[in-house]
Amino acid sequence: MEADPSLVSYADQHGEWETREISIFGVVKSFISQLSIGQELTKVSMPSIFLMPYSILELAASRHLKYIHLLISAQHEEDPLKRMAIIIQYFFSCVRDGNFQKKPYNALLGEVHKCFVKYPSYDGQSTSTAQFIGEQVTHHPPLTAFNITTSEGITLDCNVQFSAKFHMNSVSVVTTGAVKICIPVKVGNQIIKETYIIDKGLPDALVKNVIFGTRSIYWTDSVDIMCEDSKTSATVHFDKNEYVKGEVSVYNTELEVEEHRASLKGYISDVVNIDYLESKSSEAAPASSASKKEKKKEKKKAKHSKHTCSPSDTILMDTKQLEPNSTLYPKQTDPITSLGTWKEVTKQIVAGDMQAADQIKKEIEDEQRKRLQITKEEEKKERAYFKYNDDKEIWEFKSTQTLAPVSNSTSSTASDAASGSN
């Protein structure tokens, strides 16, 4: 896969548009006057001054690819308890870099976003790749489905839906939709596939002072992570000032009880510590059938420096040790793409011309409404890259072996590709 150097996403960058002051006069005053307390913001067309210069699909890609290489260590960790710690570390890395001070664009129905990252392999002898494919599969409610596949055979699948409600000078953000991570783990001479379910892609949050004062975000939720294959689970609680605490448990089949095996606490913006506890039986020891000779051989394997920030016996995550990946973008060939459709809106927001951005965005929204009335596209249960599973009630990624073209009445122009409200 080759990168197109001309393509860039502002979801990977920081700029003054993130903290730009909002004037309460003009279009903003008119917009606020139309809102009621508790109103759902994903169903209204928001002025560009409230928007980040990128789509929700771009945000999902940036968030989940930036530290995807952290998961590679789980393949080489023989202790199931510490494998769970690696999953938690990766989840924290996805949360910590979030920015909810403004809202990304609602993705267009049928909008596609593709990108990838390259990083050193675990032993540093080659280069690995992780590819992201995301698609907006429904419009009401707005639902995003995406898949990440790595060279090592790790996959990440997610159906995620965000809702944001207005509360005068604050906005509450609620996330629904689980994340499924599948990892082929090397245990001795065997490869065992483990599946981890994170019950929410992000914790719920409260964004304060969205109009007056200094904007800040407070996480207000707990998240559960489960792995039936290794009989491990974790519950993580989020609090203000990015403080987290939680515990990791292992189900002891010998005693038929769930044992509390580790506690964690700290700040996801700095350091999160972990404290491992002793098991009540020998059964919960590391799930390894490798001989001492094999273990010594494994220890001698030189890790690449990018993979040396795995959780230690006392530190779950030290943000100063994390090395982010740089996102690359292939040539965009799909009819509706995040980087193509919103290009001019993004350009005007970054330049600070909100009037021009609002006008272009309105044209996009108007064209989308016309298209949906004609095509009835919202009723479809199959998109270009995802298909709805009625039994599981989720949108599933069509693997590269089964991808088939789906008739799409949408024009390749940005206006015909337009979505509803943002």
UniProtKB/Swiss-Prot annotation:
Q: List all Low complexity biased stretches.
A: 407-422
Query: Cellular component GO terms, alphabetically?
Result: cytosol; membrane; nucleus
User: What domain of life does the native source organism fall in?
Assistant: Eukaryota
Gene3D superfamilies listed in its UniProt record: 2.40.160.120, 3.30.70.3490
User: Which GO terms fall under molecular function for this chain's record?
Assistant: sterol binding
Record-linked Pfam families: Oxysterol_BP (PF01237)
Basic residues bias locations? 293-307
Spell out the coiled coil positions from the record.
354-384
Keywords in alphabetical order, please.
Coiled coil
Looking up InterPro entries in the UniProt record yields: OSBP_sf, Oxysterol-bd
Q: Where is this region: Disordered?
A: 283-313, 402-422
Q: Which family does it belong to?
A: Belongs to the OSBP family.
Q: Which PANTHER family does the entry mention?
A: OXYSTEROL-BINDING PROTEIN 7 (PTHR10972:SF152), OXYSTEROL-BINDING PROTEIN-RELATED (PTHR10972)
Protein's name according to its UniProt entry: Oxysterol-binding protein 7
